[in-house]
């Protein structure tokens, strides 16, 4: 799913890996910042609170990114919505750039192509958070 081929560029898309690495780096950054600014002298309490803070901040960002991705229109979704408007309204202005067969193919495979992105990032983030939390507690 990460190495999904794009018809326009014929290159592998590595967006999922890049975003997952970004979230892992962000996790460690927030972890270090919260440890640095914590006022307590008990190191284990500081680390536990920092891991929890970093985990929930990143989890919120992952959720927001997933919602944002579902709400935005990339090229394929835009063409599908144009075709739906064209079929409903019969408007010349909404006439899509794809044929009806292409529309059927794209609308049938669109969810399959984009559904793994959100879950893959979440799983990689959770595994990375677990590993970094365990390492920081040692």
From Swiss-Prot:
It comes from the Bacteria. The chain crosses the membrane at residues 17-37, 43-63, 117-137. Disulfide bonds: none annotated. GO terms for cellular component: plasma membrane. It is a multi-pass membrane protein. It is found in: Cell membrane. Keywords: Cell membrane, Membrane, Transmembrane, Transmembrane helix. NCBIfam families: MPN214. This is Uncharacterized protein MG076.
């Amino acid at each position: 799913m990460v190495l999904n081929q794009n018809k326009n560029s014929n290159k592998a898309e590595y967006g999922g890996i890049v975003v997952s690495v970004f979230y892992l780096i962000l996790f460690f950054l927030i972890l270090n910042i919260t440890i640095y600014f914590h006022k307590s002298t008990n190191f284990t309490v500081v680390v536990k609170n920092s891991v929890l803070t970093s985990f929930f901040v990143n989890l919120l960002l992952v959720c927001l990114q997933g919602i944002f991705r579902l709400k935005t229109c990339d090229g394929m979704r835009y063409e599908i919505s144009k075709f739906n408007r064209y079929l409903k309204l019969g408007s010349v202005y909404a006439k899509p750039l794809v044929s009806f067969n292409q529309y059927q193919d794209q609308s049938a495979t669109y969810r399959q192509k984009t559904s793994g992105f959100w879950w893959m990032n979440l799983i990689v983030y959770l595994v990375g958070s677990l590993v970094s939390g365990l390492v920081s507690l040692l």
